[in-house]
Amino acid sequence: MQFNEIYIRCLGFQAPMSDCWDNVIVGMKVEVENTDCDNFSEDFPDSFWVASVLEISGYKALLRYEGFGDNCSKDFWVNLCSSSVHPVGWCATRGKPLIPPKTIENKFQDWKDFLVRRLTGARTLPSTFYSKVQDSMKSRFRCDLNLEVVDKNRISHVKVATIEKIVGKRLQLRYYDSQPNEDVFWCHEDSPLIHPVGWARRVGHTLDAPPAYVDRCSKGLRDKDDATEDLFPMGMKLEAIDPLNLSEICAATVKQVLNDGYLMIRVDCYDEDPNLVDWFCYHITSPCIFPIGFCAKNELPLTPPKGYLPNTFNWNEYPCSHWFCSSDRPMHKFTTGMKLEAADLMNPQYVCVATISRVVDRLLKVHFDGWEEEYDQWLDCASCDIYPVGWCELVSRRLEPPRPPNSVEG
């Protein structure tokens, strides 16, 4: 499906498994629980069978048990990233038998031969798929860390807050002076609304903080629970003139952010130097650095990262977590009508069923299903507040359903 293929793999850097979704295709085979079975025993309380992926939408897949042919009566949806979905061979490694569904158990005399024929040459999930799911949802932050975050009630200020909870890389933050019964603030860990301890003082931003916090920041002192700069990653991708070969524009990476807008940049076409001598300093306003897609837009040759061919390199297929912000970023493939799960930025504790109602360049107009258009929100195509279908289920977070027709606020 378009949503799965484009969003999770190419643009959903904040979505778990975005870097390995190429392994998930229609037609692949998996082993799942057989719910159409009564052949249980004490040794095998669960029954499993092979199923084919018929359709993919976000993390969700429509499956059909092998042997049903064109019969869709037992088709069912699952979250492919859940622990109940396994690669072919999983049962064999655990000594579990594969038992055909009761509805079709007499359809073939030799089920083993049937499976061999159906599985020969078929694709399945990698054996490490589920462990990668778990790894992809790990946050680089931890609970009890202190941060500086935009004050939701006075957005011209930042305020000291503490991480209370982490769900799927979304952080639940409590301001230092909040009462226990007051609302918390939610945002993604990659949100531009949060900053490390000491950020406001360094850049001259207005800060609301306890006197003891201000005092130790002014003295350069750190607490064990302070969020530090290393939790706010470098790694932004851009295109830059090669300082060692001024005739070429190359794929490059921001390796370090210095004060006053200076960046340490490394050109990606060379072997990485362990002594960091291949880093070069550019100012963020330098005419020698460009947003992703600059060369393509202007029909200029781009020297790709090492290991990639110039004629086939595509930024949308290159694994990177951050992009140099510009409207010139390569065009996404979101389209009107696509379904997703989106945080309501006016009430970011809620993640809701939503639809893309309009696309203008890199901007997406997100409509919350069941609500009036006045509640629509414009989001960037790379926003960390939009997710594929099935994300809430994956991270065990409540998904706010569409508002029922004719419901009244209040």
Where are the model-predicted features located?
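Eukaryotic chromatin- and chromosome-associated nuclear factors
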Residues: 1-410
